[in-house]
Structures are given as C-alpha cells and as structure tokens.
Amino acid sequence: MTPDCILLVQGLSKHFGGVKAVTGIDLEVHTGETLAIIGPNGAGKTTFYNLLSGRLVPSSGSIQFKDHDITGLPPHVISRLGISRSFQLNNIFTEMTVRENVEVAVTAQRRESWRWANRAAANKAVQQDADALLAELSLAHLSDRVAGTISYGDKRLVEIAMVLATRPELVLLDEPTAGMTPDETGRIIELVRTLARTGHYTFLVTEHDMRVVFDLADRILVMHHGSRLILDAPEVVRADPEVRRAYLGDEAADMMEPA
C-alpha cells in the first residue's frame, strides 16, 4: 500500500450462486483523486459499491481503507471510519424540511439521537453544521422547504449534503447526474470539482454520461462482466478501441470524442 493510497482492494469477488457479479477486482485509490467507474449495465458497478460500503459481504478478497481492514464490516462502522455514499435513487426524507434532512445526518455523525420533540431546541452546533453545508451547496434558500416539494436536482444536492455531513474522506457517488437536466448536471459537475479542489475528499463516481466522466475523472476504471477491463487515465481509456467498440457502443464512443 503506497503512502498516498486511501483505499486498497485486492482480489475482491462477490458471487450469488453461479452468478459472478464481481470477480477478482484489484484497485488502489489515491488520496484526493476522482476515480470514475464505468461499464455497461450488469458490469458489477453497483455490487462493487455495495461491497465497499458494507451493504454486501465479499465472497473473497479484501478491502483496506487507510489503516483499517474493512472487509465485511457493517455500513454504519464503515461510515464512521470515513466512507460515505449516495445512491442512484434519491435517499432523503421527503416529509422533512431540507434543513432537517441535513441535521439528521449531522446528528448521526455525532452519534446522537434525533428527537422530533426537541427539534426547536436542537443542538446549536448541529444546526450550525447543517446550515454551513446548505450554504456550501447553495441550498440555504431552500432550508425550510419540505424536501419532497423541491426539484429533482435539488433533492440530489440535499442527498450529497447529507453524505458530506458524515465528514467522509472517501465519497462514493452512484450516478449523481442520472435523470438530471443539462443545467442540473452542470451544477453537480461544478460542485464535485469544487469539493475535490479543497483536498478534503477522494471521490469514486459511477456514471453513464461519458461527458460527465471525462469532465471529472483523474482516472477511469472500466468494468465488464464483473471484472476489471482497464484502469488508466481518461485519454488512454478514450482511445482504447476495445472499450469504445465492445463496452460503450458507437453512440457512447462518439460521446467520448473531445468536444
């Protein structure tokens, strides 16, 4: 494990009976980088994320996060060690306000209990942390809105605010721009770029939009049938004929061309 390695995956596999969802993945993630994970549907990307975040236990292999062996640990333990993730579908409390959603995440990070009865007298530090995150993500003007009434793009931003509220060092974003308008997609791209520039976060990003991938990624991991096909710089992946023809298709290959 090199000094700048934050996540080391060795021989990671997950089989469901005879189905090999993930097979023998080796990966070293560097502190501060944004690494994109791409591949066709069924390539094993979601299963891989579920293994990293503790939602699934590996069939074999190991996962090391900094100095910790996190192989098979439950999600709440992995989160407290510094790994947090978003989901492809919004995972927020739609009947609560935007601020309350973030306060719940801040409270969980502090290992305290959320109590509706004490909402008016909530811990001031929790409120301050939540308000700071909402301001950072340009959501302050929506703080008192019920989360279920805001736009889809803003809901995605609220979920990212909740992810950041856990104070992670490694952030797993699962298709963060799925279903978004071009303007909303642009907001997410700029947000991830801004957060990456702070040096506080390392990002793994799964994404089907190749323009988003090439806008954000320092390196790209291509998965196919649960295995690692290639891991390299964007320009190398962009030029790889096997990736272009066999795993992205003609339309996606066109999207990989420089603008």
Regions inferred by a protein language model and the residue ranges of each:
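Glycine-rich phosphate-binding loops of nucleotide-dependent enzymes
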Residues: 2-259
